[in-house]
Amino acid sequence: MTEYKLVVVGAGGVGKSALTIQLIQNHFVDEYDPTIEDSYRKQVVIDGETCLLDILDTAGQEEYSAMRDQYMRTGEGFLLVFAVNSAKSFEDIGTYREQIKRVKDAEEVPMVLVGNKCDLPSWNVQNEQAREVAKQYGIPYIETSAKTRMGVDDAFYTLVREIRKDKDNKGRKGRKTNKPNRRFKCKML
């Protein structure tokens, strides 16, 4: 069974833990208890393949930022979570993305942009803004509500699909380039 290491990142209070717990335990946690770092595992079937999701729910608070490099090194894919009612959390997404790319030393890292708290009546980040940023980054955008469970499975499953795509692409590139290019042939006269 394939195991996928997923990391949930974003500013404090955007609902990273609520999304993760909704996926794992099917219930909504409405009280805010800042996370330092929690790990969850769940077996799921995605596109007919049984797999194990190893999900790291990370600290959004700045005082725990020193821990980020370590989990970014081990993660295979990242949910970049912001709250639709917080423009600041949306602005912070770029910083998380750049840090992930720096730590992974790669331009292409599997990521999904997630706009959470879509059940709230007032949004400070519009759908079009988020879609435009996702398009610039070349990643999918999913709107979620941990409270109503809207889009929760879709966000995590889309990330697994992005990881699979990335592995397929790397596998193809690796197979192509191992033989030297021989243009000239020697002839004995």
UniProtKB/Swiss-Prot annotation:
Catalytic reaction annotation: GTP + H2O = GDP + phosphate + H(+)
Residues annotated as carrying Cysteine methyl ester in the record are: 186
UniProt: GTP binding residues: 10-17, 57-61, 116-119
Coordinates of motif Effector region in the sequence? 32-40
Entry GO MF terms: G protein activity; GTP binding
Give GO cellular component annotations, separated by semicolons. Answer: membrane; plasma membrane
Does the keyword field hold Disulfide bond?
no
- Positions annotated as pro-peptide in this chain are 187-189
Is Signal given among the entry's keywords? no
Keywords in alphabetical order, please.
Cell membrane, GTP-binding, Hydrolase, Lipoprotein, Membrane, Methylation, Nucleotide-binding, Prenylation
A Gene Ontology biological process noted in the UniProt record is:
signal transduction
Q: Which CDD domains match?
A: H_N_K_Ras_like
| Gene3D superfamilies in the record | P-loop containing nucleotide triphosphate hydrolases (3.40.50.300)
The UniProt record lists the EC number as: 3.6.5.2
Q: What class of enzyme is it?
A: hydrolase
Q: Which sites carry lipid of kind S-geranylgeranyl cysteine?
A: 186
Recorded topology in the membrane: Lipid-anchor
Q: Where in the cell is it found?
A: Cell membrane
Instruction: Note how its activity is modulated.
Output: Alternates between an inactive form bound to GDP and an active form bound to GTP. Activated by a guanine nucleotide-exchange factor (GEF) and inactivated by a GTPase-activating protein (GAP).
Recorded family membership: Belongs to the small GTPase superfamily. Ras family.
Q: What does this protein do?
A: Ras proteins bind GDP/GTP and possess intrinsic GTPase activity. Plays a role in eye development by regulating cell growth, survival of postmitotic ommatidial cells and differentiation of photoreceptor cells. During larval development, mediates Ptth/tor signaling leading to the production of ecdysone, a hormone required for the initiation of metamorphosis.
Q: What is this protein called?
A: Ras-like protein 1
